[in-house]
């Protein structure tokens, strides 16, 4: 097997993947990802990021693979270098009303609408398309495939984490700064003891069992 043949069997880097998409005629490429689909409290946050073509952000990766300190560091790098960034969110009330999938897509649509540069093409993490007319491609594990999606995953995660830290000051009994709303043992115990607060997702297991107790 020649070195050229070997290249075709190797997974492209995140930057190479985006470059291949741009070579198809899309100059303005946006990556979209979300953070916070699974937690019992707080919003789901989506980010849309347009990076300059060929930018070398070698440390940018799926946000879940990075430490919080590294995410914060890369967040600043992305915000300083991106051509455009949009952040959208759906709060707990919206999630309860229309379900987490539709709330996620609504947040993604909002994030795209807040870009001051309109993208030619959108790469979306996951399997569900955003309800917009812009051409798009969904990619399973897209944050490990596309640099633009990986950047969006970091922006969404850091933005949401900072929101949850701010909620911790308002509702200190739940420990939001530590677990960011996820259903860990300490969080479940706090819900059982204090009942849900206004940012809890009342339709989610782990919360809904205590809604009547809260209302009664």
From Swiss-Prot:
> What Gene Ontology terms describe what this protein does at the molecular function level?
manganese ion binding; RNA binding; RNA-DNA hybrid ribonuclease activity
Q: Where in the cell is it found?
A: Cytoplasm
Cofactor(s), names only, from the UniProt record: Mn(2+); Mg(2+)
Q: Which GO terms describe its biological process?
A: DNA replication, removal of RNA primer; mismatch repair
Which keywords accompany this UniProt record? Cytoplasm, Endonuclease, Hydrolase, Manganese, Metal-binding, Nuclease
Q: Name one Pfam family in it.
A: RNase_HII
The family classification in the record reads: Belongs to the RNase HII family.
Protein name as annotated: Ribonuclease HII
Q: What is the lineage of its organism?
A: Bacteria, Pseudomonadati, Thermodesulfobacteriota, Desulfuromonadia, Geobacterales
- Gene designation per UniProt: rnhB
């Amino acid at each position: 097997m020649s070195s050229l043949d070997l290249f075709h069997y190797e997974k492209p880097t995140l930057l190479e993947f985006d470059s291949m998409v741009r070579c198809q005629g899309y100059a303005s490429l946006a990556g979209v990802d979300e953070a916070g689909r699974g937690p019992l409290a707080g919003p789901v946050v989506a980010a849309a990021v347009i990076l300059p073509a060929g930018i070398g952000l070698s440390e940018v990766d799926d946000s879940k693979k990075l430490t919080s300190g590294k995410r914060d560091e890369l967040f600043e790098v992305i915000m300083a270098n991106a051509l455009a960034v949009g952040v959208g969110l759906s709060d707990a009330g919206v999630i309860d009303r229309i379900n987490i999938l539709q709330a996620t897509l609504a947040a993604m649509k909002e994030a795209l609408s807040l870009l001051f540069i309109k993208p030619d093409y959108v790469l979306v993490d996951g399997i569900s398309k955003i309800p917009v007319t812009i051409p798009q491609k969904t990619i399973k594990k897209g944050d490990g495939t596309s640099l633009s999606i990986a950047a969006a995953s970091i922006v969404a995660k850091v933005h949401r984490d900072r929101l949850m830290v701010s909620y911790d000051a308002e509702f200190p009994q739940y420990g939001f700064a530590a677990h960011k709303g996820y259903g860990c043992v300490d969080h479940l115990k706090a819900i059982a003891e204090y009942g849900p607060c206004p940012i809890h997702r009342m339709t989610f297991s782990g919360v809904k069992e205590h809604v009547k107790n809260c209302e009664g």
